[in-house]
Design a protein with these regions (language model features):
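Near-N-terminal "mature-domain entry" segment
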Residues: 1-70, 74
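Extreme N-terminal leader/targeting segments of oxidoreductases
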Residues: 2-6, 19, 27-35, 39-46, ...
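Conserved redox-cofactor binding core of oxidoreductases
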Residues: 108, 118-142, 253-350, 359, ...
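N-terminal Rossmann-like FAD-binding beta1-loop-alpha1 element of flavoenzymes
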Residues: 151-178
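Glycine-rich loop(s) and the adjacent beta-strand/alpha-helix scaffold that form part
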Residues: 168-194, 217, 223, 338, ...
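Redox-cofactor-proximal catalytic regions of oxidoreductases
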Residues: 196-276, 320, 476-486
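FAD cofactor-binding and catalytic pocket of flavoenzymes
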Residues: 231, 398-521, 554-556, 562-567, ...
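A conserved FAD-binding loop/helix module that cradles the flavin
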Residues: 602-623
Length: 628
C-alpha cells in the first residue's frame, strides 16, 4: 500500500535527484529510492507522516520564493542550491533538511548494487536451527480466541529487565508468564540488511524522538529481547561512584557497591562477558588506538561484551545473525522458558488488574482477542519511555512518574584516511577510550553500515556522494555524555511524547568530546574529519579546531542521538521524590513492580544493560521473598 501521495512522491523524487546525484561509479538516486522510503513512511506514527508532508510543502514555498516554480519543476542545480540554503541556514531549516534527507539517505544506500560496487557486505545468509520441543509448548503467537490463565507473576516486557526477572523467578519454581508486544524473531530472520531490520525490529521503525531545543532520536527495540536484541553488546558495570552516590544521597543502601557485586557476577556469568577479541576490532579500532597512543591517552582498549563467540558480522544493532551476542532473546528468555515460564508475543497490555488495593494481573490484546492473566504480582518492564504511560493509564499518580528522564546524549564523527578501513568487517562497537570518563565523556566504537554512516554528516549532493564512494577508507567513532539535563515522557492523543531540553553543560561536553575525537583522528593520520555540527561539516586539519573551539554552539547546532533512556519511574526511599521503593515495588501499590531502565535513579555514564540486569536479578530475589 502506498503511503505517499502522488505529489509527495514527485517532490521526494526531485529532492533525491538533487541530494544523491550520480558519482564516479555510484548511481544517482531515483524513483526506486522513493519506493523504499514509502515503505518506511508506513512505520511512522501519523504525526510524523503529517510532518513529512509539511516539510515538502515548505520546500515548495522556498522554491517559489527563490525560483518562482515549485521545487520539482526547478532544474536540478537550482534544487541543490535551495537545499544548500536550508543546510547552511537557520536552525529550523537545518533541522528540517536533516529530517527530510535522513530517510532518503537510508533508503538510497539500502541497495545491494551499491554495496557490491563498494565491496561491502550487504546481507547475511543464515542457516535456520530447529527449535527444541519445549519451545512450541511455551511460546504463543497471536491469539485466535479470548483466553484467561493464572500464574504467580506476570512480566510485561522481555528486555534487560523483564527477561531477567522471568528467568530468575522461573528457576526458583515460580509460575511466570511473559507478555511481549513484539515478535520472537530467530537468527534466520536477521538478514543483516540494516534498513530492513530497523523497520522490523525497532519501534516506529527507529523513529522515536525526544523533542525540546533539538530533536534527538532514541531508537527502541520492539521484539523479544527488547533493545538488547538491537544494541551493541557492550557490558559495563555501574560505576562504583554512581552506586556510592545512590547509597549516600538517595538512601539506597542496598545498592552500595559491595552489595551489588554478587548480582553483577550472576549477570556476567549468564552473558559470558569477555573483552572483544583484538583481531575483530577492525580498521576503526586500529586507527583509534593509533591516535589515542599518539596523544598520550592511556585508558583505552577492547570493550567488554556479551558475545564470546562473535566472528565480526558487523550488524549487532540489527539482530545478530549468528546468535553470538547473548541478548535476552538468546540468553534469559530461553532460560526462562526452559524453566517453565510461558511467553505470549504480539500482545499489548493495556490494563493492570487491581483487587483489594493490590495488583492481581493484567489484560492484554492480541489479534483482536483478549488475554487475561491473573497473578499474585505484576512486573512492568516496558522500558523508560513506555512504562510510565502504562502506569499512568492504570491509576498510578506518583509525582515523579514520567519525570527525571536521562538519555546519555551521544555524538560521533567520520574521518577519511588514505588506508583501507573496511568498517563493515569486525565488531561495530569493540573499542573504548576512558580517559575522559571522569569528565562525563565515554568513547566507544560506533562503526555503522553505509546507509547509516551517510546520515552522520549533513552533506548533500556531490560532496556526499564523494564521501560514500570513499567508504572503504572512512572510519567512524563516537561517545556519550553522562547528562545532567533531564526530560519527561507523556501521552498526548494516544501517542508517546518525549520532552528533553539539552542543557548548556551537556552541550559543552558534546563539544569537548568532538574536539578530542578530531584530535585522535588527525593524530592517527586522517585527511578529513566530518562533524555533525552546523558550520563545521568538514575539518581539513587539526588547525580547523581553533575556530570550532571559539564557536558558541547551541543544542540545535549538533546532531545528537541517544540510546539509554533511564529514570522515569526511579527508585528511592521517599515516595515524593521517587516512584518505586528499594524492592522495585511502586509506592502505595502492593504487588506492582517496575524492573527496567525506568527504575534506574540517575544517569550512570555507561551502557545500562548490565545495570538493569543486575537490578532485575536483585528484584527477582525480593519478589520471590515477598511471595513467600
Amino acid at each position: 500500500m502506498a503511503h505517499l501521495t502522488a505529489s509527495q512522491r514527485d517532490s521526494l523524487v526531485a529532492v533525491v535527484e538533487a541530494v544523491l546525484p550520480a558519482g564516479r561509479f555510484l548511481p544517482a538516486g531515483s524513483a526506486a529510492t522513493v519506493d523504499r522510503v514509502d515503505s518506511f513512511v508506513g512505520t511512522l506514527p501519523s504525526p510524523l507522516q503529517r510532518g513529512l508532508g509539511g516539510l515538502l510543502a515548505a520546500l515548495d514555498v522556498s522554491a517559489l520564493v527563490h525560483g518562482r516554480r515549485t521545487f520539482a519543476r526547478l532544474p536540478v542545480a537550482t534544487r541543490l542550491a535551495v537545499l544548500e540554503r536550508w543546510r547552511t541556514g537557520d536552525p529550523v531549516r537545518r533541522l528540517a533538511l536533516r529530517a527530510l534527507t535522513t530517510p532518503l539517505k537510508l533508503a538510497h544506500f539500502d541497495d545491494p548494487a551499491l554495496y557490491d560496487r563498494l565491496g561491502c557486505v550487504y546481507s547475511t545468509t543464515v542457516r535456520p536451527e530447529p527449535k527444541p520441543a519445549w519451545f512450541s509448548q511455551r511460546v504463543h503467537g497471536k491469539l485466535d480466541r479470548d483466553e484467561s490463565i493464572e500464574c504467580d507473576v506476570v512480566v510485561i516486557g522481555t528486555g534487560a529487565g523483564g527477561a531477567v526477572v522471568a528467568r530468575e523467578l522461573a528457576e526458583t519454581g515460580v509460575a511466570v508468564v511473559m507478555i511481549e508486544e513484539g515478535h520472537y524473531f530467530d537468527r534466520s530472520q536477521f538478514t543483516g540488511r540494516p534498513f530492513q531490520m530497523q523497520q522490523r525490529l525497532y519501534r516506529r521503525g527507529g523513529s522515536t524522538f525526544a523533542f525540546g531545543n533539538t530533536p534527538i532520536p532514541i531508537p527502541l527495540g520492539q521484539t523479544v529481547g527488547g533493545t538488547t536484541t538491537v544494541n551493541s553488546g557492550t557490558c559495563y558495570r555501574t560505576p562504583d561512584r554512581v552506586l556510592a552516590a545512590w547509597d549516600r544521597e538517595l538512601g539506597l543502601h542496598a545498592l552500595a557497591p559491595a552489595a551489588m557485586v554478587p548480582y553483577f557476577d550472576r549477570v556476567e556469568a549468564v552473558l559470558e562477558v569477555a573483552r572483544a577479541k583484538p583481531e575483530l576490532l577492525g580498521g576503526n579500532g586500529r586507527v583509534i588506538a593509533r591516535g589515542a597512543n599518539a596523544l598520550g591517552l592511556v585508558h583505552h582498549g577492547p570493550l567488554l561484551r556479551n558475545a564470546p563467540a562473535c566472528d565480526g558480522q558487523g550488524v549487532c544493532c540489527f539482530g545478530c545473525p549468528t546468535d553470538a551476542k547473548r541478548s535476552t532473546n538468546v540468553s534469559y528468555v530461553p532460560l526462562a522458558l526452559r524453566a517453565g515460564a510461558e511467553l505470549f508475543t504480539a500482545a499489548r497490555v493495556g490494563r493492570i488488574l487491581v483487587e483489594g488495593g493490590r495488583a492481581r494481573g493484567v489484560v492484554a490484546t492480541s489479534g483482536g482477542h483478549t488475554l487475561t492473566v491473573r497473578a499474585r504480582a505484576v512486573v512492568v518492564a516496558c522500558g523508560a519511555l513506555l512504562t510510565p504511560l502504562l502506569l499512568a493509564d492504570n491509576g498510578v499518580r506518583a509525582a515523579q512518574l514520567g519525570k527525571n528522564l536521562s538519555i546519555h546524549p551521544a555524538c560521533g564523527a567520520l574521518a577519511e584516511f588514505d588506508e583501507p578501513i573496511a568498517s563493515w568487517r569486525g565488531i561495530p562497537q569493540g573499542y573504548m577510550i576512558e580517559d575522559l570518563h571522569d569528565e562525563g565523556i565515554l568513547y566507544e566504537g560506533a562503526a555503522v553500515p553505509l546507509e547509516f554512516s551517510m546520515t552522520m554528516t549533513p552533506l548533500i549532493g556531490p560532496e556526499l556522494v564523494r564521501l560514500a564512494e570513499a567508504f572503504d577508507r572512512v572510519a567512524s567513532f563516537g561517545f556519550m555524555v553522562e547528562d545532567t539535563s533531564r526530560g519527561s515522557v507523556h501521552q498526548i492523543g494516544g501517542q508517546l511524547v518525549v520532552r528533553y531540553w539539552l542543557g548548556d553543560a551537556d552541550v559543552a561536553h558534546l563539544k569537548r568530546g568532538l574536539d578530542v575525537l578530531a584530535q585522535i583522528y588527525f593524530a592517527a593520520g586522517a585527511r578529513r574529519v566530518h562533524f555533525p555540527v552546523a558550520g563545521f561539516d568538514v575539518l581539513a586539519s587539526v588547525d580547523d579546531l581553533a575556530a570550532f573551539r571559539r564557536a558558541n554552539l547551541h543544542a540545535w547546532d549538533i546532531d545528537v542521538t541517544a540510546y539509554h533512556p533511564l529514570g522515569t519511574a526511579r527508585m528511592g526511599v521517599d515516595a515524593q521524590s521517587s516512584v518505586i521503593d528499594a524492592d522495585h515495588q511502586v509506592h502505595g501499590a502492593p504487588g506492582l513492580y517496575v524492573v527496567d531502565g525506568a527504575a534506574v535513579p540517575t544517569a550512570i555514564g555507561v551502557n545500562p544493560q548490565v545495570t538493569i540486569m543486575a537490578l532485575a536479578t536483585r528484584a527477582a530475589d525480593r519478589i520471590a521473598a515477598a511471595l513467600g
